[in-house]
């Protein structure tokens, strides 16, 4: 492959930005952040559950599945890699008990969700039978007949043809594949469980059986990432022609394997690309997708056809929908 030099984006006005990637970077998904919650606020939480919902506000449901084949070295979510089928069934039972409690509250009871999101962890780690048990229980408590979108995160190595068919039959409309990169060495050194061949197989069959939307995730600036490998990954992603692509920049929060190694070695700077490089690589990716006809719709997302491809979960989150989150460490 011929060498390509990625031009830097224009420098922002104002004070210089931090260049090195250090530990402790994280995003705030809710406000105020959990770290600022106080014991004396619990009565306010219960009071909110006992109020009738505001008229016209849609309801969304986030369900956390915290199981994985292995923990990625950069992962900062609550995950388990050592649970057997009996322990997983116990977790699913508890999930439905939690949803039962919420479904009995005035703010939730009688409402039908507009969008549902299965995140993790790895939701596709569950077997088809486990998934059916969970979703049947959820539908009995909060019917899905008015749902516009069901998003389901999947790790390519767990997505057999049989499981993909089962996921589609459950009503999933938006499959989000955690690809992250197409280079097997990059995947291995960063602790990913899947490899590039599994990406191609899972993606092709997901297309064949007609998922309405397929999103793929990429991460810029992973451990041992190079400009050449990033260019190749972007080219392969464009060639797949997914409905949307979410592009993250590598971060190293404190509860990651990378940080533990940094701490043991007394290092302050993470062994990943610096912020300037990551911004440049993301800018390059956006440019390549735009050349292929995609539209940038957020700071992390490009979409093939904005008139057709909607991300109802994100739109609801940004516009003030009620979102009920269930499961360990859900948000």
Descriptions of predicted regions:
Residues 69, 252, 330-331:
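Short, solvent-exposed loop/turn segments at secondary-structure junctions
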Residues 61-63, 177:
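Short beta-strand motif preference
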Residues 63-79:
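Local cysteine-cluster metal-coordination motifs and their immediate loop/turn environment
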Residues 60, 73, 150:
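Divalent metal-dependent hydrolysis catalytic cores, especially in the metallo-beta-lactamase
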């Amino acid at each position: 492959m011929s060498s390509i030099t990625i031009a830097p984006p224009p420098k922002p006005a104002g004070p210089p930005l931090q260049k090195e990637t250090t530990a402790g970077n994280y995003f705030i998904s809710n406000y105020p952040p959990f770290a600022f919650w106080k014991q004396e606020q619990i009565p306010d939480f219960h009071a909110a559950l006992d109020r009738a919902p505001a008229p016209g506000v849609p309801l969304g449901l986030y369900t956390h599945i915290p199981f994985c084949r292995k923990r990625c070295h950069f992962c900062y979510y609550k995950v388990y890699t050592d649970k057997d089928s009996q322990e997983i069934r116990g977790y699913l039972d508890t999930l439905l008990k939690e949803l039962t409690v919420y479904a009995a509250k005035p703010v939730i009871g009688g409402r039908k969700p507009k969008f549902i999101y299965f995140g993790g962890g790895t939701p596709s780690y569950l077997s088809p039978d486990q998934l059916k048990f969970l979703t049947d229980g959820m539908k009995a408590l909060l019917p899905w007949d008015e749902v516009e979108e069901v998003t389901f995160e999947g790790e390519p190595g767990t997505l057999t043809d049989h499981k993909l068919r089962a996921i589609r039959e459950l009503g999933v409309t938006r499959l989000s594949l955690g690809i992250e990169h197409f280079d097997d060495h990059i995947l291995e050194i960063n602790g990913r469980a899947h490899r590039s061949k599994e990406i191609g197989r899972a993606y092709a069959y997901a297309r064949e059986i007609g998922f309405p939307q397929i999103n793929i995730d990429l991460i810029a600036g992973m451990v041992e990432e190079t400009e050449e490998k990033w260019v190749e990954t972007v080219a392969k992603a464009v060639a797949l022609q997914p409905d949307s692509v979410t592009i993250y920049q590598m971060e190293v929060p404190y509860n990651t394997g990378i940080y533990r190694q940094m701490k043991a070695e007394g290092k302050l700077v993470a062994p990943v690309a610096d912020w300037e490089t990551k911004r440049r690589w993301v800018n390059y990716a956006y440019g390549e997708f735009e050349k292929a006809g995609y539209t940038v719709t957020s700071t992390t997302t490009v979409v093939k056809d904005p008139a057709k491809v909607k991300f109802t979960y994100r739109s609801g989150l940004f516009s003030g929908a009620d979102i009920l989150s269930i499961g360990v460490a859900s948000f």
